[in-house]
Every structure is written in structure tokens, then in C-alpha cells.
């Protein structure tokens, strides 16, 4: 039986990301270097808000890895669970029940990190 821990999934996701970076170094350098550096920095919009915006987009795009990554990075930048759920509510307002079902991935992640009950 497969372990359904979202935190174990996150660890595996980062391991596979590192593995693919070594197989595609030029693309990885461009994408994880200059492209991300140009976007994910403080500017007119602060970095935490950009990560929350990215979370809403990840929910809409149905990208599980992106949802986990953006939630993790938003938390590292000081986002509260309230801010994360408010971000989810924006995504849900645009995407309906499909987005709601994807926001459950975020809730599961927060629960496993023991940030919510």
C-alpha cells in the first residue's frame, strides 16, 4: 500500500526535482535562476504576497506540486494559515467546487504540519 502522507510526497517531490535538475542543467539554471529570480523577489508586490498569488494560480492549474511548494514557501515567509485559507477562497471563488477540492490538498498539508486541526 502506498503511503499517502503529503509531507513524504513533498520530500519525494524535491528529490525528483533535484534529479531532473541534474539531467537538464541548462534549463534548470535558466528556470530556477534568472526566471524565478526576476519574479520571486520583493518589488511593488512583496514576496509573501507573490507566493500567495502563486498558490491561488496553482489551485486553478490543478498542480499538486505547485500547491505544496507555494504553501511551504508562503509559510517560510511568514504567511498565516488564515492568509493561506483566504488565498484558497479567492481560488475557489474563481474555480468553484473543482478548486475547492484542490484546496483540500493545501488543508491536508497544513494538517500534517500540525498547523490546523
Regions found by a protein language model. Give the residues of each.
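Acidic, glycine/proline-rich low-complexity segments that act as flexible tails and inter-domain linkers
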Residues: 1-49, 102-117
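Iron-sulfur (Fe-S) cluster-binding segments and ferredoxin-like electron-carrier domains
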Residues: 29-30, 69-81
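Short, thiol/selenol-centered motifs that function as redox-active sites or metal-ligating centers
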Residues: 53, 57-69
Amino acid at each position: 500500500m502506498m503511503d499517502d502522507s503529503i509531507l513524504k510526497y513533498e520530500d519525494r517531490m524535491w528529490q525528483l526535482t533535484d534529479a531532473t535538475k541534474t539531467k537538464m542543467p541548462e534549463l534548470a539554471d535558466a528556470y530556477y535562476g534568472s526566471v524565478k529570480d526576476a519574479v520571486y523577489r520583493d518589488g511593488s508586490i512583496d514576496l509573501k504576497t507573490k507566493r500567495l498569488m502563486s498558490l491561488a494560480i496553482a489551485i486553478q492549474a490543478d498542480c499538486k506540486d505547485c500547491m505544496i511548494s507555494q504553501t511551504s514557501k508562503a509559510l517560510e515567509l511568514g504567511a498565516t494559515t488564515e492568509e493561506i485559507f483566504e488565498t484558497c477562497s479567492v481560488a475557489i471563488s474563481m474555480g468553484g467546487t473543482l478548486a475547492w477540492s484542490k484546496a483540500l490538498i493545501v488543508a491536508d498539508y497544513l494538517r500534517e504540519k500540525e498547523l490546523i486541526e
